[in-house]
Amino acid sequence: MNIWVDADACPAEVKDILWRAAQRWQVPVTLVANQLLRVPASPWMRAVQVPRGFDVADAHIVASAVPGDLVITADIPLAAEVVGKGVAAMSWRGEVFDAGSIGERLTMRDMMEELRAGGVDIGGPAAFGQADRRAFANALDAAMQRWARTRGAGGKPGAV
């Protein structure tokens, strides 16, 4: 298993949680961004800087992630693309995206985009807070425990 992080706008608190999880579970975590990122010295954590451009980091993640991996992103179209490949995905607020939920989330996202394009002020997401941090940590821990159970049973892909 590899954990891929859409890191351009990822909160520092989430990166800290991922660093601790990488150490605890000895799972590689790759932060992908179009800017230089500093990561703690660890054999389990690395950063990949991609060229600037629309969805370049997303394209790198889609090309790299395979079933059995986990993608961390707030980008619904990216989540939809990796879920379509059989890769597990979750937001940094702890929302798990799967084949049963991603279609609805994508439809909602597209509707909000249309409203914004039409001039409707719908606001943005709330600031990342303590409840979000806790929800992410809990969702990540649950995913890692599922992975550990399947690893003991042969590490079947897509089991996160």
UniProtKB/Swiss-Prot annotation:
InterPro entries, alphabetized: UPF0178
CDD domains hit by this protein: PIN_YqxD-like
Domain of life, source organism: Bacteria
Signal sequence annotation: none
Pfam families in the cross-refs: DUF188
Family of this protein: Belongs to the UPF0178 family.
Protein name: UPF0178 protein BPP1051
Species whose genome carries this gene: Bordetella parapertussis (strain 12822 / ATCC BAA-587 / NCTC 13253)
